[in-house]
């Protein structure tokens, strides 16, 4: 393996570590799209934890960045925005953590990721992992749990009713990582009826096990299917993919003054159909708080702590559906291919070095 510098300027010790990185955008089918490399170990900044990574999960964000990002010449980008591991050292401003703590986190998109034996992560966006989960089970949760929580409670504000309409939420693309935890949070923390979409029998069965009240097919007319349910007009909609296709249907079926959230990246989006009903549109980008270092950056650590509590109480469950032993380039390429196909149910996790 070759030793190369980080793509982000950080202070390093002389210790090296195994990592998986890339130096040019390539398709997941190319054996050089991800490479086993060796890097200097990061040194924690004042607010940082230095974590020995035990397990990671792969998300659509990893696939998107790998496919389009070109690191600076001679440098490698390390992906990975889900991890669970053990704290090895803490920065001078860290409170509430110590060496030996078992933690989980998503991290920040503007820093090196978790495909490495050691990772420096801001302690304010991390939490102690659920005690009842192993590292692999815990690593499946952070990014999707944060995305789902922020969407439901910060963007859609589901605790604030839409006057005169059904307390129902339509979740487009329910069986993936984000959808799987969204269903659980709604079922556990609200009395909202959950309408989730799926197109395959295994996806429908998965959603019903998680707690969806109704499952409809996103390949057919959403307004017609929702009307046939006989539960009234939904107040909220959460679109996880292909929003440019579904937005006109969501505008038709949603209640006046309803709210729509999305997390994908449509090339163009015509929001004019929303005006006649005063429907609001909200983007959720989980990395906003750490990327912009917002005043409430610590809310992410608080959310993950609450999620861990709910897991340990048996009220939330890990969404891992496949675990691959060994964090290395070959296995990560395989996981990227699985995510790229777009038919994942739950999450794929890699554990151990």
What are these regions (language model features)?
Residues 141-220:
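Mid-domain Rossmann-like dinucleotide-binding core that forms the NAD(H)/NADP(H) cofactor-binding site
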Residues 160-162, 214-284:
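Glycine-rich cofactor phosphate-binding loops and adjacent beta1-alpha1 units
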Residues 12-15, 315-322, 333-353:
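C-terminal capping/lid region of NAD(P)-dependent oxidoreductase domains
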Residues 273-323:
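C-terminal substrate-binding/catalytic core of Rossmann-like NAD(P)-dependent dehydrogenases/reductases
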Residues 101-102, 118, 259:
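Residue-level marker of beta-strand positions
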Residues 114-115, 198-206, 268-271:
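Short, glycine/polar-rich helix-capping loops at beta-to-alpha or helix-loop-helix junctions
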Residues 110-123:
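A structural motif shared across PLP-dependent enzymes of the aminotransferase-like
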Residues 40-57, 67-110:
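Glycine-rich beta-strand-centered segment in the early N-terminal region that forms part
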């Amino acid at each position: 393996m070759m030793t190369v510098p980080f793509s982000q300027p950080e202070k390093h010790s002389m210790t090296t570590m195994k990592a998986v990185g890339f130096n040019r955008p390539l398709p997941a089918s190319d054996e050089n799209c991800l490479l086993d490399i060796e890097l200097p170990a990061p040194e924690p900044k004042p607010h940082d934890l230095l974590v020995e990574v035990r397990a990671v999960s792969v998300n659509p964000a990893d696939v998107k960045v790998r496919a389009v990002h070109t690191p600076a010449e001679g440098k490698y980008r390390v992906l990975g925005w889900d991890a669970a591991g053990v704290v090895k050292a803490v920065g001078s401003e860290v409170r509430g953590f110590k060496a030996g703590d078992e933690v989980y986190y998503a991290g920040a998109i503007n820093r090196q990721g978790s495909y490495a034996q050691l990772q420096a992560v801001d302690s304010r966006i991390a939490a102690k992992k659920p005690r009842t989960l192993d590292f692999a089970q815990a690593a499946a949760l952070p990014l999707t749990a944060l995305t789902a929580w922020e969407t439901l409670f910060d963007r859609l504000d589901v605790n604030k009713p839409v006057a005169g309409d059904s307390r129902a939420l339509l979740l487009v693309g329910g069986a993936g990582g984000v959808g799987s935890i969204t269903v659980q949070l709604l079922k556990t923390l609200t009395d909202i009826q959950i309408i989730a979409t799926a197109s395959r029998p295994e996806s429908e069965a998965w959603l019903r096990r998680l707690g969806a009240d109704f499952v409809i097919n996103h390949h057919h007319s959403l307004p017609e299917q929702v009307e046939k349910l006989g539960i009234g007009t939904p107040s909220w909609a959460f679109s996880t993919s292909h929003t440019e296709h579904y937005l006109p249907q969501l505008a038709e079926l949603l209640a006046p003054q309803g709210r729509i959230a999305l997390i994908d990246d449509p090339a163009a989006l015509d929001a004019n159909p929303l005006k006649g009903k005063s429907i609001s549109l909200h983007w959720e980008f989980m990395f906003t708080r750490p990327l912009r270092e917002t005043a409430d950056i610590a809310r992410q650590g608080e959310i993950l702590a609450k999620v861990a509590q709910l897991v340990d109480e048996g009220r939330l469950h890990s969404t891992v559906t496949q675990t691959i032993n060994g964090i290395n380039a070959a296995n990560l390429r395989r996981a990227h291919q699985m995510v790229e196909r777009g038919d994942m149910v739950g999450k794929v996790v890699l554990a151990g070095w």
